[in-house]
């Protein structure tokens, strides 16, 4: 069973300011929690396009959304190809786009996916199981410098150098095949006092490898740029992030688009090309309530930012 608790569901769907006849995009279908809330508000010409590259998520969503057949289209693709995929379907403008950038709970919980540092499983971490690059290749084939860079940048891990060195030493003896083996190596690399504070010692390194395997930050930047272009005036873009790297990208791109270019002094009327592209709806991100965090601890780090196309 595909069980997934949707984070900030009401806040994000309300944030989209849905029109019943509008065209909406859920870039991260997952357990279809957001998609279901969106599609149930659509009537007549309203339509939802939902992206996921996980076949299991798509087949589950097809069943979940079956009462709304005709009002939604499921697209098996990375959301970085949103513009091309929508254009193939004749869609050139939309009224709202939603991103929920958390890894869905079933992906974390399925042992064979290799996302979790709590369970021993093959090193995989691919969102799209048909792609060739997996965590096994990153851990066993990328050189020391590349490993150190991704663990430092994507994991914001202060012991990146020590961890990369320990991985390099370990794989010289034999390939690192499982998440359990990798966790033990990371624990060995981190000084004992640091292991006792700040959560699980492997958390940051696992995040870094997952981001590298799936090019998550590159995909998000491309997709958010496309979303800003495709959204029609008064349409909304809602982004739920779960770590500072993604939140920083969203914050910066929203801020840049809400400023517009510098206007030459002395103009009586501001030309269209100097007007801001977006208006920020949330000056500060919306975060989950204490009640939501109590019900779903994975919501703890979630942040929702909303912008409206001008």
Curated annotation (Swiss-Prot):
This is Ribosomal RNA small subunit methyltransferase H. Its EC number is 2.1.1.199. Specifically methylates the N4 position of cytidine in position 1402 (C1402) of 16S rRNA. It is found in: Cytoplasm. Belongs to the methyltransferase superfamily. RsmH family. One of its GO terms (cellular component) is cytoplasm. S-adenosyl-L-methionine binds at residues 32-34, 52, 79, 100, 107. Keywords: Cytoplasm, Methyltransferase, rRNA processing, S-adenosyl-L-methionine, Transferase. InterPro entries: RsmH, SAM-dep_MeTrfase_MraW_recog, SAM-dependent_MTases_sf. Transmembrane segments: none annotated. It catalyses: cytidine(1402) in 16S rRNA + S-adenosyl-L-methionine = N(4)-methylcytidine(1402) in 16S rRNA + S-adenosyl-L-homocysteine + H(+). The gene is rsmH.
